[in-house]
Structures are given as structure tokens and as C-alpha cells.
Amino acid sequence: MKSIELIDIESIASDRAGITREDGVIELLSEADEALGRRPYPSSPTIRSTEANIDESIGNRQLWLQSIELNGEFQEDDSEEVEETIGKKPDDALVCSDACSAPDVSIQELLQTFTPPKPHAGRVMKAGAGPVRGSSRQTSSKLQTKDVLQDILVELDDNLSSWDTPSTSGIRSPETVATLAAKWANKTEKTSGKPLYGRPRSSGNRGNILLKRTLANRNNILSSELGGESSPSLQALTTPLPAKSNDGDKNQTTNVMTTGGFRLGTMEKQTLNGSACVDRIQQVPVSSPESVSFLEGLSDIPISKPVQLTQRCIAATNTGYTKDNCASTPRSAAAVEYLEPIDTDTSILSTAGEALPHSPVKPSKVSRERSKRDYIVHSKAFTAEESKAKIRQLMSNTALKKQFNEVNKVTREKQSLLAEIVLSINEQVHQYLLEQKVPIAEVLGPTTVIHNFESVPIIRFKRKCTSMYDLNNDIYYPCETTMCNEPICLLFYNAVDFFTKYKNQKQRLYSEVQDLKRAGNKVIIILNEYSRLEKSLAELENRCMRSRVEQQLTGDKSPRRKTVKEVQLTALEMNSKDLGRKVNEMIIKCDIDIFPINSAASFANWISNLVWVVAKMRYDPMMKNVNWSHINVKIGKTPTEVLSKTLQQINGVTEIRAGRVTSTYPSFQQIFTDFEKGYLVAGKDGNPLMTKVAEKAMNALLMSEDPEEQIYIN
């Protein structure tokens, strides 16, 4: 490596082409010296300090700083060769590029008047070890390499601020500082391998670097599109696509090189027991003169707080498809794709019962029969021999054969089905409906209405069964008329009475509901005049507010007489917004359904539809073959419509949200392909296409290998 010696002497025109000697140092003088007098060498660092600060700093500590403010052209220069300037004319284009600006001229004035301090004890000074500045006006003193470098790096606050503050000099990496130190120390070692840290430097044009794979999260610390030669916040993150996870691979290491406040180093993500992770930043040692660590002595130096990136914040590059070298789901090359790793943890998914969503144990035949028996009353599981004997007995008699054919008809009339249902209504509820001029018996038609005198306002469904159902052979056998209870019941409350009981007798209300559920009933609570109560509470709030304002204005504090209704509403100690919250609390805690209705007439219309559903439930082929009820069910005409209808069955996925998914994945095949890769493409706005619950449900639906695995739908 050739040493460049800056010599400042009072030369004349006749000496510009000559060679002189001073103190044993050969001085090369040419026309370029005049240019050097006007404009310093482009690699000269900018020093904004005084002589007193340099003396005090050199005397107190020895510094090898992490970053300094250098001109962009010198930082981009990694070569150790310098063109000879003898006999060349000064050319600004060769001295400095357009991307960098000339340093301050104050560096020459400082070096002209600066007298280096005496070396510290134990330090060996070698002649010719670094750049020398000769002066004809002052004593010719030679600054050693380490002293010059320490003088340049002494301004800690200014230099560190230049590292955190984006500039127009391009992307800067501290790896050039080590090369700079090697240059000035007159070292000839060359790094043939990869750089010690950061991204390897390319000699060509950087080009626009786009992060093709990032997370579909608006709160992501990475910008949606990073690129451009002058982008100060450019971050290069490289990580392999997550393949199928192995049990042995629990540590993932990602090399990160960032600018603008990120600390250089190696980020290691360690998973502890598969649940918690620890991000650890380790500093990489850098070679420096005399084997001094480049980052040594920086423990007391304030530096920017590092940003620790978790695994969800790591993006992988891609060039046109959702996975490299895969021809599925093509994307536009000009657009940036956002891919989010799929979380396959289905622990948050739940089913209607208490069974685990992913039970590894295959449900037994008895459990399937029990679930079928819950919907088909008066049923029994007959063996093959028992069924043959029963059929042989029925076919031997003409009357029994006629009854056997009658109970096994495929199509049944609506009136005959409604005639099988018996509605047991609480006496108080029946009287209330009559007071509201709702003749429930006439509304229900062929359905029989009877009264019960239970302590709760309950409505039970019963069925007059003339046959027994064989759960194993799907056959009805004629029998004597038997009254059976259907697994469904209603609790009819006026909204005011319900919330009064909820406030004063909450535990009793919960106990009544749980007793009905333990008996195998599906409990539905009807809240009559719910909207009327909501409006009454809102009006009461307005009257109370108006009364308080009038009292403050007039000073009249005489109590106003309240009506019975106002007293009842005031005793609830609720406002109009509390009603919905109380209803949701009851639904979640008791696992029941609550239907608010406006009037008794609306209830009559609603219960007539419910009676028809209960009446045909025992003979519905879907209920008799629950495990195969999905066969031959067409929910759409096109693959996109089928996918949309399937997504809408997931809780919380509306038609609009399903359309958001189908706009990116028009068919099951395309979304299945990306589920196999472990990533899903985000929407055009950068947000996820589905919620976490919907994503987990779809992942279990498409990727599960267990045919008995349960999926949360609704």
C-alpha cells in the first residue's frame, strides 16, 4: 500500500515539477499540489474540533469508535491502491463524485497549526508509520498514524449523531472503518473472505432492493416497500423460507445488517419450550491495529438503542411468486408482496361441547349413537339379528306390515308432522299471551297446546311418537303411542322481569339454566319487549339529566314524584348500554341462546317456525346421518363461490370478508398451495386476509391428517 503524504510548502511555479528533500522525506511536487491546497483529498474526514479538545481527549482515553462521519466516496472505497497524482492535472470529477460533498477546509488549517502531544509511556513511535504533514512555516513534526486517527475520532457526540442521522451519502457500514485504519496504519493485509459482519459490498450498482416477503401487519417495524439508491432507511434482511419444522431445530439465527439506529451484530432467536423466545444481540469483534478490538472501550459511550426483531418481523425476498421457483399464485413484479407465516396453534379453537378441538382419540360408535339419540327421540340401537327378527315379525301380519310401511315413508306431510308436537306452556305465560290477544293455540294449528305449572316460565316441546327408530339400521318400527320430550325448551321472560331477576337473583337464574342443561335440553331464553326497555332506559337517563340541569339553574331541589315504571327502571341500576353487555355475559357463561323480541305477536310468529323445525327434525335425513350430511350439498356454482360460502361458515367471517379472501385466492387449490408453504398473501392494503381464528380453522381444515379432528366453524 502506498502512503499518501500531504505536504504543504510555499512552492513557486518553478518548483512544481521538481523534487526536493526535507528531513529525509522525499517530497513529490506537481500541479496536483495546487489543487490539494484548494481542496483536500476526498477521503479526508471532517474534523470539527479544537486543539484543546484534541489534547484533552488524547490524554484521557484511547478510542476506537464504532462509527465516524466520513465522506461517502471514501466509505465506498475498499481498495488499497491509490492512483499516482504525479504529472496529472487537477480534475474535480476524479477527486470527488457527485454523491459526496467536499469536506471542510478547516482540517488543513488545523493540521498546519497543530502540534502533536508527546507519546504516552510504553508507546513505540515508528518513523514513517502514517501520513506526515510537512510545513515550511512551522516546525516539521510528523503525526503518527494512531495519533491522527485518534484525533479524527475524538469528537464523539458529533460522530455518533452522524451514524443515527440519515444522510445523502448512501448506506454506510462500519466495516469501512476497519479498512480505513488498515490503510492509515500502512497495513497490506487483504480480506479475501466474507466481511466480518454486515452484507458483502458489491462493486456494481446497488439497484432498487425490494423486500418481497414481509408480514401483513400494519404495526410492522419494517416499511411496506424499501428501495431506492438514496433511501436512508434501507434494511437488508435475509432469512430462508420456513420449511416444515423439525423437533431438533429449535434455534434460528439470522444475520442482520441495518442502518438508522440498529446495532450491528448477530440476532439469535432461541425458543424455550416452544412458547417463549429470547432475542439476543451479540457484537462481532472487528480487527484493528495492534489487535485492539474495534468496539473495545465503548461501554461508557451512549449509543442508539437496538431494535430487536422477533421471528414474525423477519421478511424473505421473492421475485414474482409466493414461493421461489413455484408457479402458483403469480404476482406482479412491480408490486411488493406481503406474506405472513401461518400460526398453526389451534389451542384457541373450541367446539360446542367440552371436547378438545383436536382430540387424538377417535370417538367410539357408542358416542356417535348418543349424539344421534340427542336429536332423534324414542330411538334404540338394534343389532343385526334383532333387526331381522323385528322385520320378520312385522312382515308376517298385514296390519303390522301396513304400519311398518307408514312409519318408514320417505316424504311426510307438514300437517301430520305438526300434529305429533305437543307444546307445554307455563300457565302464567299462557295467560300473558291471552292478555296480549295472541291465541297461541290457534296460531300453532294442528299442534297440541297444554299447560304446566312449573315455577319457571318454561315452554317444553313434546312429541307423540308412534314408532321407534333403529340407530344402526336407519329403520322405524311401529309401536304404541308414546309421549317423549324433545331436547329443547324455552324460557319466556319480559325484559324488565328478566333483568330484575338477573340483578337480585343471579345465582338462582344460573342454577335454573344449568339444571335444564344437565337434563340434556337446549335452552333458549326469550326476552319480550327488549327494545322497549332499551328505549325506556334511554328516556329515563335523559329525564334525569334534564332534572339535574334544571335544579342547578333554578335552585329548586324539591323531589319530583316518580311513576311506578320509573321506580322499577331506577331499581335496575342499569343504563341502555348495559343491557347488551349483560346479555352477552349470560350467553358466554351459560352457553345458551338469547333472542330479544319486540312484542307477543312477534313471539307467536317466531315460535310457529320453531315448532315446524322441531317437528321435522326426527325424520330429517341430515339428522339421521350427521356424519355424511355434507355429501351432495351444493353451496355454489363456481369454485370461487364454493370457497366463499365455506369461509362464511366460520364464525366472524362475513360475505365481505370472504370476498376479500377470494379476490386473492379464487379456489381451494390456490389457498391450499400457500397453506402448504406456511405463508398467506396479505391484501392490497397490507393487512391480513383473515383473522387468526379463521386462519387456524382453515389450516386445520386443509392440513389436518386426522379424519376425526374437530374444526371450529360456528
Curated annotation (Swiss-Prot):
Keyword set includes Transcription: no
Record's compositionally biased regions (Low complexity): 223-234
Keyword Hydrolase: yes
Segments for region (Disordered): 223-252
GO aspect biological process, one term: mitotic intra-S DNA damage checkpoint signaling
One Gene Ontology MF term: endonuclease activity
Biological role: Interacts with MUS81 to form a DNA structure-specific endonuclease with substrate preference for branched DNA structures with a 5'-end at the branch nick. Typical substrates include 3'-flap structures, D-loops, replication forks and nicked Holliday junctions. May be required in mitosis for the processing of stalled or collapsed replication fork intermediates. May be required in meiosis for the repair of meiosis-specific double strand breaks subsequent to single-end invasion (SEI).
Recorded family membership: Belongs to the EME1/MMS4 family.
Name of the protein described by the UniProt record: Crossover junction endonuclease EME1
Organism per entry: Eremothecium gossypii (strain ATCC 10895 / CBS 109.51 / FGSC 9923 / NRRL Y-1056)
The encoding gene: EME1
